[in-house]
Amino acid sequence: MKRNLSFVALLGALCGLILSSCGTQTEVVADRHAEWVYNSVVYEMNVRQQTAEGTFAAAEERLPFLKELGVDIIWLMPIHPIGEKGRKGTLGSYYAIKNYREINPEFGTMADFERFLNKAHELGFKVILDYVANHTSPDAAWVTEKPAEWYVRDSVGEPVVQYDWWDIAKLNYACEDVRKEMKEVQKFWIEKGVDGFRCDVAGEMPDDFWTESWNEIRAINPDVYFLAEGEGPNFHADGFDACYAWKLKDVMNNIAQGKQTTGDLKQWIEEFTTEYPREAIQLMFTSNHDENSWSGTEFERLGAAAKTFAALTYVLPQGQPLIYTGQEVGYDHRFEFFEKDPIPGWEANEYTDFYRTLNELRHTTPALWAGEKGGELVYLTGVVEEVLAFTREVEGSKVLCLFNLSAEPQSVIPTVAAAGEYTCAMTGEKATIEAGKELHLEPWAYVILTK
């Protein structure tokens, strides 16, 4: 916050800049997504670590806080019973599912889940479930009760284990009955009232399975939201609303660590905006359950740039920002993935204010909306390489964004006016943009101006 305030004090020196578009995409006429998707913020809830109790009943008490924070979509990590065979740690991986139609007793009962879901809907949230279609636990009833062809099996007839996931058994999507049953699982939860799915390791399943699912589920509810844990234009062709921005996450980490530059970020933006359809949405994040537990917290990976890159995920084109459990209070801790490791306290602090401000910006600034609704990115020329400077504008909504993505102070001397009266999104202060004077940016400083 302090970096932004010092920057705002110098805004009178900012001059207008020549604008250049980052890429060309096909225009879209009809809305591709449910209306509530475009300006939404996703919150990934780790029920086990959300509260000391680690239950739906306790998590329900957290919903008013999240409502005030301004998130819109609650993504629940897997909520189903966890297998015991090959279990990792004491409590096991959420992703080693024993029964898709039941609730993990660690979290409570089906009635507890339904109360949580109803309360979330009363408060205006959408709730999506983690849908793990690639595999079950090795002791799921299907392994012995269903025909052998339901699973991919090795040379001695045992279910195949992928990677170091010895606590799972891979399902066989060449088997039509598996496809049918997994689509029935989706329908079961849609009928319970959930609003969509985050689809685990989506690239492991055939593309046509997702297309079939999309068609059948949206015949029941056309506003269902599908998020792919995968990255590539093919996921949008398959019917997904959004996929992961893994490459962006890597570039941000590398810039913060001095391994890449703003030029690499611009290259990623160019590739995305030319290779993906205009309506494509990418989930943008500085943390999630995988990054936090296996790669480190955003503070470990991004250091002094943690807030800067978090803010960037809110303003890049076609993006949908994600907040992971604990980020809203700046919790700098790697969660134990297979054990109980709850957040010790939820006192609101500067990070709460930071994310609340960004969420409000997201809701009220059409230029920043996702997919085809938001404004295209137009670069400001005449700036040093270390500074990412651009505008986005649509239907009278405009943002001007400047990010010093380096650990050194930077200066900009623009040449062509793009002057006007703006409001600083993070402070609410008014800013007059004038032409012809030098602008100084502190290390990792950023500013988001709206009009």
Task: Set out the residue ranges of the language-model regions.
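Bacterial N-terminal signal peptides that target proteins for export
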Residues: 1-9
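C-terminal motif of bacterial Sec signal peptides marking the signal peptidase cleavage site
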Residues: 19-21
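Substrate-binding/active-site clefts of carbohydrate-active enzymes
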Residues: 25-72, 78-192, 212-221, 225
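Short, surface-exposed beta-strand/loop micro-motifs that present aromatic residues
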Residues: 31-33, 271-274, 310-313, 322, ...
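Short, solvent-exposed turn/loop segments enriched in Gly/Ser/Thr/Pro and often Arg
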Residues: 75-89, 130-139, 200-206, 229-233, ...
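Active-site-proximal helices and loops of the catalytic beta/alpha 8
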Residues: 118, 184, 200-285, 303, ...
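Carbohydrate-binding surface patches
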Residues: 379-415
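C-terminal beta-strand-rich structural cap/linker in extracellular carbohydrate-active enzymes
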Residues: 433-451
